[in-house]
Amino acid sequence: MKTPTRLLISLSALALVLASCEEAQLESNDAELPQVVAAPETPASTKYASQNRPDVRGRIGAVSAGHPLAAQAGLRVLQSGGNATDAVIAMAGVLAVVRPHMNGIGGDAFGIFYDGETGEVAALNASGRAGALATPEFFAAAGLDQIPGAGPLSVSVPGAVAGWVDAHERYGSMDFADLLETGIDYARNGFAVSTRLAQDFEEQGANLNQAGLDLYLPNAAAPPVGSLLRNPALADSLQIVATEGKEGFYQGDIAKRLSAFITEQGGYLRPEDFANHTSNWVTPLRGDYLDHEFIVMPPNTQGVTQLALFAMAKSHDLKQQGQNTADYLHTLIELKKLAFADRDRWVADPEMAPVPVPQLLDSDYLRQRALAVDMAVAAVEVAPGFGEVAAAAPNGSRSDAGDTVYITAVDQWGNAVSWIQSNFAGFGSGLLDEATGILLHNRGALFTLETGHPNQVAPGKRPYHTLSPMMALYPNGQFAFTLGTPGGDSQTQTIIQITQNLLMFDMTPQQALEAPRFRSQTGNRLAIENRITEAVLRELRSRGHELNVIEGWTATFGGAQMIHRDPATGVLTAAADPRREAYAIAY
């Protein structure tokens, strides 16, 4: 994928296709969202041709990112002759600054890469591990039977920075330091606070420490909309990463300062835990569905769950049922429960625990599993298909959190990247280190303390991860599309709904993202957008689903992004979900 600079196109020659971002309520407050009136009675076969945003098409390159400033940074890289990996790194650096509660250099990342010249697909696991002190006995001595969802004990080693550097070393073409310049500039000199960002800060900032409150909620309120938000300490840290790479973060002053800060707060990370961290190039998982080959991350992520969901869907005639009919929605919801029961029982770090991926993806097994769906009644509890039920407790301090950013780019040489990075929950652990400006994630909260569970905490172990970027190829092996979304547990659910909108119901990428969605939660709890017809909602209730009908367009249902390539013309169509602040640009 490394490609020398071949093309320089002036920004003045480009008319950016930008659309306003819809404001949305936060998914962390699902239970507090009011019930609203559903859509009027309309034919169940309605195709959602109307859309909030235009289709964004280009013939040379495209980007889609979780914030317009990030998308613009990625576009500039592509137009300056950089490739898709260069663009993703630049966008990641900007998002670490302008969406600080959702991601940053204190969090984790994963990426899938397509080489336009060779057709090679590679996957990078840039998630961090528990420290050497993180034994079950350590937590038992603290009187805990569950790892806290925030605070110092929820912090595992941040992996994002190593991921940026490793991705650049393998595929990047521009100078690494140059790629972080825009993010550093926004951190040092400020960026304008949006309405959505101010709302996020106020609704998610309750667990912030004093340094975090001083920066993001001064005087107990978010910075005024339109004001400039600066984090000069973070700018300094990003500059160290830009000039010193991984060593500057994991072996230098940043690691020493962060480990000291975590120790002061009562956490378990020490300098050697940072120094020992590595990313890993891993073999992605592949599965066929709807005449495409889908590429996902292997465990420790829930990518295996995505492929299982696709495989089980083959046993039901979803197209005949009709998009967003009661039968269609009920089937997908019940299949999700089956897939998640296996996920919660088995998905963990395969370097430290047995994860039976071949059995979880066995076609005969999944065909039989899919037959367990009762079309008349929603299942309240679903057991895993194999393994002791007693060991199938949810992993760690699981919540419906989904405070993540997704990034994707396709360049003029046909290279494509699907990248995701996250703090896990809003503001992560709630711990902002004033000296470095780094907010630490809380991904370590997803370990369990249950004896014998594959995801039981252990030194040097990676926790189970919800992060699940995806890529699809045409049958001839050529790139088809990237797709990803924030949303925690809803990521796999959102991806199958969008995929079927695109491939089964012939929607454009933007239509596929904007169509009404559901989010199955614990038990029979179901968040669903009010653009679903009232007749369908009544039928779902009659089958036992406990509905929370939510007004669109809220962040409860993720914030998906996609870049699709037309196999006949090569035209790229980039899409960005209006439910959050995502932006798509193509040229």
Per-region residue spans from a language model:
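Extended C-terminal subregions enriched in glycine
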Residues: 461, 495, 504-555
